[in-house]
């Protein structure tokens, strides 16, 4: 393996943290780490064992040859309280992501980032934690990226009964360049937000 098991576990932890809620496939880990499958299996088993302890708040989840870090279900009541704690208003970037998701759902993080032109992972995590967005499925294709959509809480917070009440987009919105499309989403959505404040 080259490195000792402690170093490998730390590297895997960093990779899974950076991958966020999309996780990493076994193939991706093998490619990045440049090791053989038996070695990876040993490392992942050790990582999983370490997270099983009572002193850890996260656990390693494996599904369909994909690994991801997740909070333990035992701590759900505390996470729920965190979501319910009043927080400051949404940033412009958060409103922009909400606008894109609300009009284009279901949509992947990569598609959101393509429209915005910047990374959006932290904003997505924050909006999911606030229960404004949620996972609505998985995209077809390599990696099976998470598809995001809005939640009933989103509708409630923005004074909407259904998504049909969102301001309509101009018919030529699909023909605009990506940056103009992002600006249009934000402009329309921000107006709705201002109207209900």
UniProtKB/Swiss-Prot annotation:
Any single biological process term in GO: chromosome separation
UniProt subcellular location: Cytoplasm
Keyword tags: Cell cycle, Cell division, Chromosome partition, Cytoplasm
GO cellular component, one term: cytoplasm
InterPro entries referenced in this protein's UniProt entry, alphabetically: ScpB_csome_segregation, WH-like_DNA-bd_sf, WH_DNA-bd_sf
Family that this chain belongs to: Belongs to the ScpB family.
Known partners and oligomeric status: Homodimer. Homodimerization may be required to stabilize the binding of ScpA to the Smc head domains. Component of a cohesin-like complex composed of ScpA, ScpB and the Smc homodimer, in which ScpA and ScpB bind to the head domain of Smc. The presence of the three proteins is required for the association of the complex with DNA.
Name of the protein: Segregation and condensation protein B
Organism: Bacillus subtilis (strain 168)
């Amino acid at each position: 393996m080259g490195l000792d098991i402690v170093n490998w576990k730390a590297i895997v932890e960093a990779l899974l943290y950076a991958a966020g809620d999309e996780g990493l496939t076994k193939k991706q880990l093998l490619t990045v780490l440049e090791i053989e499958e038996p070695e990876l299996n040993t490392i992942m088993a050790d990582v999983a064992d370490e997270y099983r302890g009572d002193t850890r708040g996260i656990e390693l989840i494996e599904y369909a040859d994909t690994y991801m870090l997740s909070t333990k279900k035992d701590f759900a009541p505390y996470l729920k309280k965190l979501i319910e704690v009043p927080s400051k208003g949404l940033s412009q970037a958060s409103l922009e992501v909400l606008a894109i998701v609300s009009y284009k759902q279901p949509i992947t993080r990569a598609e959101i980032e393509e429209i915005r032109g910047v990374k959006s992972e932290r904003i997505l995590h924050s909006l999911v934690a606030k229960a404004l967005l949620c996972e609505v499925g998985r995209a077809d294709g390599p990696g099976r990226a998470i598809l995001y959509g809005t939640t009933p809480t989103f509708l409630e917070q923005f004074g909407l009964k259904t998504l049909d009440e969102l301001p309509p987009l101009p018919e030529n919105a699909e023909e605009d360049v990506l940056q103009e499309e992002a600006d249009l989403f934000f402009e329309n959505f921000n107006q709705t937000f201002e109207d209900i404040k």
